[in-house]
């Protein structure tokens, strides 16, 4: 294919043309390409295929809902039963007490919904200077304009003629609480609307929080009247062995952002859980209550909501959140054993999501390309790391086989020459 019609996401098109992998079917934790290759999905696609691919009961739910009503919006006076049922279910499992639910079409939508809402909230309560959003270096918060602007991945903000598409953002060190404190002092708490963070940083290289980090961050947020947003687009719905990572890491967010695992990828859906402090001004002032002017065409989509409900039922019925916690222990053991490899600089884990970070002399992208030949789909992350985050239905041995393949590929990546610790570029 020399000139494809499809412009792939996040792709250097001249490099991928002619080497694209066309995935045509899946079953469980495996995918099949148009060449007949059967590949283990070691990343659960983009962190979301938690219950595995091509479950017939999910297809049946979609079919039955479409036969009744495929979609209807939830703007103004209108609503629908599936959106109501899903919202009630999410409230019942939320780490936030008595939240309200805003539904939309995915993670990037949800980030924009959360960030716009905190700006609107502060204006409503008369604190109109509180506009700045603080995030962490190397963080990823989607690719809509606001998410791109707050992201800590510099390469996602480059090329648009300004540091931020939306003004009023700042980034702090991902581990250093002191940097956050200094940034509050520099910008002024009276100007800061919110702090946003992934409980476990994903695309930035799978960085779990250091002990005590979020306790101190939350203390500073409370003391300085800064709203705290937990971006659980990746970690939500079992990825860290709890339904939400906020529970595991004892977070008390004002807003939780979710997507991905809420449907396990069977339909596009995301949303936010909003704490009473933030939602009350929009509900409890009668005629003087403001309207939050936000919504998407497919907010509360019936088929997506029905699939989310079935997905949550499957997670509970099959004990897959507990299974994720058990798989974390297997993955942790395997990562510990690979950490001593000559080409590995670190192996990190936070829930059933981990990464193998490689030395600069070898390319994570090249290793992930080679792993496809061994039957495993992985993905390069920031920091020259390899993403590992399989579905929750993965077998213990499949985790071991995956890490065995990583070791084999690293073992066969021979340096051109070696002089003590100084090495030439690796040829693989």
Kindly give the residue locations of the regions a language model identified.
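Conserved N-terminal phosphate-binding loop of PLP-dependent enzymes in the Aspartate aminotransferase
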Residues: 1-428
């Amino acid at each position: 294919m020399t000139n494809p019609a499809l412009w792939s996401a996040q792709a250097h098109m001249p490099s991928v043309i002619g080497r694209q992998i066309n995935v045509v079917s899946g079953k469980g934790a495996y995918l099949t390409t148009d060449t007949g290759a059967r590949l283990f999905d070691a990343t659960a696609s983009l962190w979301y295929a938690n219950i595995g691919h091509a479950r017939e009961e999910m297809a049946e739910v979609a079919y039955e809902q479409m036969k009744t009503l495929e979609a209807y919006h939830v703007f103004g006076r209108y609503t629908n039963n599936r959106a109501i049922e899903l919202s009630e279910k999410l409230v019942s499992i939320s780490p936030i007490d008595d939240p309200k639910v805003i539904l939309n079409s995915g993670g990037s939508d949800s980030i924009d919904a959360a960030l716009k809402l905190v700006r609107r909230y502060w204006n409503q309560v008369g604190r109109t200077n509180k506009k700045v959003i603080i995030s962490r270096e190397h963080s990823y918060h989607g690719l809509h304009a606001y998410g791109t602007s707050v992201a800590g991945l510099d390469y996602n903000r480059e090329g648009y003629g300004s540091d931020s598409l939306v003004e009023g953002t700042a980034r702090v060190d991902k581990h250093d609480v002191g940097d956050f404190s200094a940034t509050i002092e520099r910008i002024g708490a009276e100007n800061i609307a919110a702090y946003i963070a992934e409980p476990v940083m994903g695309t930035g290289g799978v960085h779990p929080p250091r002990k005590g980090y979020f306790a101190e961050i939350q203390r500073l947020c409370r003391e300085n009247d800064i709203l705290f947003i937990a971006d659980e687009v990746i970690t939500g719905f079992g990825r860290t062995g709890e339904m939400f990572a906020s529970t595991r890491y004892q977070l008390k967010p004002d807003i939780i952002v979710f997507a991905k695992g809420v449907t396990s990828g069977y339909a596009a859906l995301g949303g936010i859980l909003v704490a009473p402090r933030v939602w009350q001004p929009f509900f409890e002032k009668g005629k003087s209550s403001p309207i939050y002017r936000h919504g998407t065409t497919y907010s509360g989509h019936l088929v997506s909501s029905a699939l989310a409900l079935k997905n949550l039922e499957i997670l509970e019925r099959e004990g897959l959140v507990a299974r994720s916690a058990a798989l974390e222990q297997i993955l942790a053991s395997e990562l510990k054993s690979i950490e001593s490899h000559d080409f590995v600089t670190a192996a990190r884990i936070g829930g059933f999501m981990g990464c193998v970070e490689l030395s600069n002399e070898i390319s994570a992208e090249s290793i992930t390309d080679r792993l496809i030949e061994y039957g495993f789909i992985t993905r390069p992350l920031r920091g020259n790391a390899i993403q590992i985050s399989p579905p929750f239905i993965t077998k213990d041995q499949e985790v071991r086989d995956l890490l065995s393949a990583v070791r084999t590929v690293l073992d066969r990546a021979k340096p051109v020459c070696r002089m003590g610790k100084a090495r030439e570029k690796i040829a693989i």
